[in-house]
Amino acid sequence: MSFNLIVDQGNSACKVAFIRNNGIESISFLPGKAGQALSHLVAPHRFDKAIYSSVGLPDEEAEAIVRSCAAASLMMGTETPVPLRLQYDRRTLGADRLAAVVGAHSLYPNTELLVIDAGTAITYERVSAEGIYLGGNISPGLHLRFKALHLFTGRLPLIDPSGISPKIAEYGSSTEEAITAGVIHGLAGEIDRYIDDLHAKEGRSAVILTGGDANYLARIIRSGILIHPDLVLLGLNRILEYNV
């Protein structure tokens, strides 16, 4: 029984979770670096354990805050032990990717897993039923595909995918529709291919989708999936409990 603080520093924002007895009690989003906003958020609380993780260079101020507000703390690094065996160069593996697969394996042990994190980039991670991280792939995310077509061509417009319906025509009847159909159908086909390969090769298996675009992508993928938007936070909590 513990009350834990999870601080996940991303590229443009910081996600802070309070987890009590392995269940998420609250999640807060802090723009930019955590700093003073984090200090105000955690000030009324005293945590049993705390973990700080960053996809880039660590924020020393945030690390100091995390250390000061808990009885025991952990700064996530490339040498931090995790409850998985890794077949990947740990030095090049992002903390968010690692936390996602740890979280997935903790939720679905003894299961062949494909973990899809749909953010700026889309990552595809494979975890064996025995708890071995077999590796992963990285692909451009939904928004990045639209931006690339606009930035690296002469006249193609920028399409905002935020308002696009999941029901897309097979072929477009305008340039805007053609871009939309090409990106959406292409991405859906890519994801379905990974899922089909998993199910064809493995018996008991599960596909877990997380990340900012997870809910939208779940509506365009024909294969059955499980959605866990807070997978990285759950994984960081599992790593914290494993070490402290």
From Swiss-Prot:
CC cofactor note: A monovalent cation. Ammonium or potassium.
InterPro entries named in the record: ATPase_NBD (IPR043129), Type_III_PanK (IPR004619)
A Pfam match: Pan_kinase
Location(s), subcellular: Cytoplasm
Biological processes, Gene Ontology terms: coenzyme A biosynthetic process
Cofactor list: NH4(+); K(+)
Catalytic residue list: 96 (proton acceptor)
Chief localization: cytoplasm
Assigned EC number: 2.7.1.33
Known pathway: Cofactor biosynthesis; coenzyme A biosynthesis; CoA from (R)-pantothenate: step 1/5
Binding site for substrate: 94-97, 175
SUPFAM superfamilies: Actin-like ATPase domain
Gene3D superfamilies found in the cross-reference section: 3.30.420.40
Signal peptide start-end: none
GO CC, one annotated term: cytoplasm
Keywords on record: ATP-binding, Coenzyme A biosynthesis, Cytoplasm, Kinase, Metal-binding, Nucleotide-binding, Potassium, Transferase
Residues binding K(+), per UniProt: 117
UniProt: ATP binding residues: 8-15, 120
Reaction(s) catalysed (UniProt annotation): (R)-pantothenate + ATP = (R)-4'-phosphopantothenate + ADP + H(+)
GO terms of molecular function: ATP binding; metal ion binding; pantothenate kinase activity
Keyword presence, Glycosyltransferase: no
Self-association state and partner proteins as the record states: Homodimer.
Record family assignment: Belongs to the type III pantothenate kinase family.
Its job: Catalyzes the phosphorylation of pantothenate (Pan), the first step in CoA biosynthesis.
Protein name: Type III pantothenate kinase
Source organism: Porphyromonas gingivalis (strain ATCC 33277 / DSM 20709 / CIP 103683 / JCM 12257 / NCTC 11834 / 2561)
Native organism taxonomy: Bacteria, Pseudomonadati, Bacteroidota, Bacteroidia, Bacteroidales
